């Protein structure tokens, strides 16, 4: 595809708006999604809207950076420093980014049934995704796995957080929950469990079994990704919870 061609001159199947309507947004490249927001490119003989979208990503991806990670936190001034991006285009892009954050971080309503790790991760997204400090939180559920509430238990540093089983189960009991999911974030974005994460999970499983409050999962979240330790370890086989 030639990025200097006007979008209107492209075959309809290659035009971002038409492609989105026909195939769905997930099938568009990042440059094509940006092109829809931009509306126009740099003008006749210069970059088209798609070309400008690609150029923005190239500029943000310098020095081996993830361009979308940079775009997530970019300022208006940084965007407008890119040739072809004025106040109108910059504010449109920033508004779309903020709307995306709010949609992603929206919590399930009370009484939502938490029956899947992805639903649990979404319920904790606003507290744990894209955070600069490690946080440890709990999802409090009733016997039918309906959401009672969420609670951040501890806040640590950029590299570690300290959560004691005593503090975790105190909150669970105080809220009257009969099932619990625990979660913490890794600010680095790497959701691989550390030896300390696994050791804490073992302690929590033992405590949950003793208290007859099943621990349904331990999630690790970071930069929009998550890992379910129940699905990826054998810890629940070693200490069944009767849930």
UniProtKB/Swiss-Prot annotation:
Keywords noted in UniProt: Hydrolase, Metal-binding, Metalloprotease, Protease, Zinc
InterPro entries noted in UniProt: MPN, RadC_JAB, UPF0758, UPF0758_CS, UPF0758_N
Gene Ontology biological-process annotations: proteolysis
Pfam family, one: RadC
PROSITE patterns: MPN, UPF0758
Binding site for Zn(2+): 184, 186, 197
Boundaries of every MPN domain copy: 112-235
MF annotations from Gene Ontology: metal ion binding; metallopeptidase activity
Residue span of motif JAMM motif: 184-197
Family designation: Belongs to the UPF0758 family.
NCBIfam families: PRK00024.1, radc
Name under which the protein is recorded: UPF0758 protein Cyan7425_1778
């Amino acid at each position: 595809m030639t990025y200097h061609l006007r979008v209107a001159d492209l075959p309809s199947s290659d035009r971002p708006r038409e492609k989105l309507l026909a195939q769905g947004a997930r099938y568009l490249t990042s440059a094509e999604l940006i092109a829809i927001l931009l509306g126009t490119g740099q003008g006749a003989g210069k970059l088209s809207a798609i070309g400008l979208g690609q150029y923005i990503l190239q500029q943000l991806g310098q020095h081996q950076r993830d361009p979308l990670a940079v775009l997530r936190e970019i300022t208006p001034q940084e965007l407008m420093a890119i040739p072809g991006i004025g106040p109108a285009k910059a504010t449109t892009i920033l508004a779309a980014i903020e709307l995306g954050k709010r949609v992603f971080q929206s919590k399930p309503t009370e009484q939502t049934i938490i029956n899947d790790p992805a639903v649990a991760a979404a319920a904790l997204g606003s507290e744990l995704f894209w955070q600069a400090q490690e946080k440890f939180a709990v999802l409090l559920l009733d016997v039918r796995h309906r959401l009672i509430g969420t609670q951040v238990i501890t806040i640590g540093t950029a590299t570690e957080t300290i959560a004691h089983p005593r503090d975790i189960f105190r909150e669970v009991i105080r809220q009257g929950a009969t099932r619990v999911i625990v979660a913490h974030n890794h600010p680095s974005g790497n959701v691989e469990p550390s030896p300390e994460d696994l050791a804490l999970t073992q302690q929590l499983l033992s405590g949950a079994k003793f208290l007859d409050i099943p621990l349904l999962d331990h999630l690790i979240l970071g930069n929009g990704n998550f890992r379910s330790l129940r699905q990826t370890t054998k810890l629940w086989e070693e200490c069944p919870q009767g849930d």
